[in-house]
């Protein structure tokens, strides 16, 4: 069957000139053909993500058209403004895919608001809400290597699409022939017909105003003398991040020249992920990923070296800074709420408790943090939300968008650094003070990759075996509790393919398949009297679980 589909593509008059040579090159190679055509990229709550190329299991204009027709069919049942917002990052073909999606929507009579240049995830989420759209599309593969691209879908609240909506869109995609089933007009035709319009300056200004309103100590940075080295990792963060930092008074910004301008090949950093040290090894301090929803920093240590701050550590530092600062300034709301994912550090729970903040723990995926904001909004209590984070370098400190935002993350990190500098301290010193107060937590993530067509089956088999044969001990420590998030009646959260093992010494191990990549991730949390003890515990646990996950 996949050979028939391959032959159909080979015979078709394809508009993308890059696809024909690829199809010709793999002729007669059953393994290569099967990899491209045996399955289709699956549309889920995170949309699509895959390697660029020809076939149903690749990202190309035909797969984008098919997905967008499915989305359009759903939008047409939703009433409202019949409008979709679109943005895109610097990845290869992101602009082409964005305009392709706009053409499909316009052909279906759906209005489009698209950014006139690349803009990040938070800008897309904001525009979706600002224009009261039915949906939003962000063309990006986030932090994946350069050969990938993707398509994130958002609901009318600016949050990533719900399970129910994504299931309907997926069903509509299944009804749409990938090569011929989508309605389509050119981008120029859509503009001429008045169906496609660019996002206005009023929307961009409103976004910047909303971000800057969340400063904890407004005006501090104008006199702090903070010097910053910044890299947008050749992505979409350059304009919004520097705009906000300049507005708040940080003007001494050195941009890493090799990583300043959009470049989908990411030639200086093959894996443009701000949690990978390669992205920060040029001696810089701050980096945002290509779609600017995540931000990482390297802080300067007393000996002049740089140390990468983990996503968990930065989440705790920002929570601590926001709480202390808002209490000091009298801007802390009554009954404040913070939100984090279940795989993020329990140190944040201890910090929240210290400041009298309710900490809510949700499933992995920032949409669940957005869901908590929506619940507060529905109750007329959205001002209670002060901060949300995930260990994977995603932060949000306001309800103006419903996805992680590296722009506000960058702003608050810089403000925090400026504040500690102004009192003769540093981010590094404050982190050590937090550990001294609450205990030396260590949080580490390991990943096990399962490539190829059989990868997903292998992952499913491993997860099922862990449920059929529950672990009773790890590294000589008894497992005192197994929490299976596939049992919502026990967790109080929606069902998810996550297992958490709590050990007798207080350590935890979380095992979950990645939602976007063929990986099983393990999250280790250990607590020791010092870093060496916590690291030794983690190493022992990692060694014990590795053979189980291979």
Model-inferred region functions:
Residues 6-101, 190-191, 195-224, 236:
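An N-terminal, well-structured beta->alpha segment
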Residues 37-57, 141-142, 228, 232-244, ...:
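Conserved phosphate/anionic-ligand binding catalytic regions in large, soluble enzymes, centered on
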Residues 85-148, 244-295:
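N-terminal small/polar loop signature for handling phosphorylated ligands or for N-terminal nucleophile
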Residues 96-105, 148-154, 241, 293-311, ...:
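Short Gly/Thr/Asp-enriched flexible loops that form oxyanion-binding sites at enzyme active sites
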Residues 116-177, 275-287, 292, 316-322, ...:
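Phosphate/diphosphate-binding loops
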Residues 282-284, 288, 305-307, 325-512, ...:
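Phosphate-binding and adjacent anionic-ligand microenvironments
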